[in-house]
Amino acid sequence: MQLTERERDKLLIFTAAQLARERRARGLKLNHPEAVALITAEVLEGIRDGRRVEDLMSFGAAILTPDDVLDGVPELIHEIQVEGTFPDGTKLVTVHDPIRGAASRRVAGEYLLEGGEIELNAGRPVTTLTVANTADRPVQVGSHFHFFEVNAGLRFDRAAAYGFRLNIPAGTAVRFEPGEEREVDLVPLGGSRTVYGMNALVNGDLDAPGTREAALEGARAAGFGGAQ
């Protein structure tokens, strides 16, 4: 047989699903990989049989019940996505909450969260700036990037952004599409307030004497938007 990578993956899924079927037939409760493999394989077979995407989305959520799996497994599987070849092309079947009907109960290892909203950077001053993307491509800025040094194609008050970062959750980012103009909230960088790398406009202590003025001059000389 000459098999593609995708075909080998499907055979691996089939093997795992067959193991899950045998264990289920013996009365064993399925773990996470077994449950995912079984549902995925059944959806793939449904695709092979010529069933429609809408039908398979419902079918995929009726294959297993909470009684078929170990405690906590339904809560681990929020969705399963299966790509398959239909008569009219390749499509993605997404099964949301594939193991439904789990009773509301505490699950081992889960987090019990208090209600309400978390305020980002509580008590820290917030500066709002209007930013325009004058570049011909999208620009994405991460949460802790020194905003003063972001892509030169973004136009805003650079001086006001010196020593600030985006007021968004750590690890997230804001994307600016070409020609887009939007407001962003900034908060002061914390910690030791030392910045290295980026666009090499600071490379040191943000608050050291003369650093801000030198960084602004460097931004102007390099043509950074809004530094003039």
Curated annotation (Swiss-Prot):
Annotated keywords: Cytoplasm, Hydrolase
Coarse class of the protein's main subcellular location: cytoplasm
Coiled coil: none
Catalytic activity from the UniProt record: urea + 2 H2O + H(+) = hydrogencarbonate + 2 NH4(+)
Name of the top EC class for this enzyme: hydrolase
EC number(s) from the headed UniProt entry: 3.5.1.5
GO biological process: urea catabolic process
UniProt KW Cytoplasm keyword: yes
Annotated segments matching region Urease beta: 102-228
Pfam families membership: Urease_beta, Urease_gamma
UniProt GO MF annotations: nickel cation binding; urease activity
Keyword Hydrolase: yes
Compartments, record wording: Cytoplasm
Alphabetical list of SUPFAM superfamilies matching this protein: Urease, beta-subunit, Urease, gamma-subunit
Pathway: Nitrogen metabolism; urea degradation; CO(2) and NH(3) from urea (urease route): step 1/1
Origin superkingdom: Bacteria
Annotated region (Urease gamma), positions in chain: 1-101
Record InterPro entries: Urease_beta-like, Urease_betasu_sf, Urease_gamma, Urease_gamma-beta_su, Urease_gamma/gamma-beta_su, Urease_gamma_sf, Urease_subunit
Cleavable signal peptide: none
Family: In the N-terminal section; belongs to the urease gamma subunit family.
Oligomeric and partner information: Heterohexamer of 3 UreC (alpha) and 3 UreAB (gamma/beta) subunits.
PANTHER family for this protein: UREASE
Record-given protein name: Urease subunit gamma/beta
Protein's organism: Deinococcus radiodurans (strain ATCC 13939 / DSM 20539 / JCM 16871 / CCUG 27074 / LMG 4051 / NBRC 15346 / NCIMB 9279 / VKM B-1422 / R1)
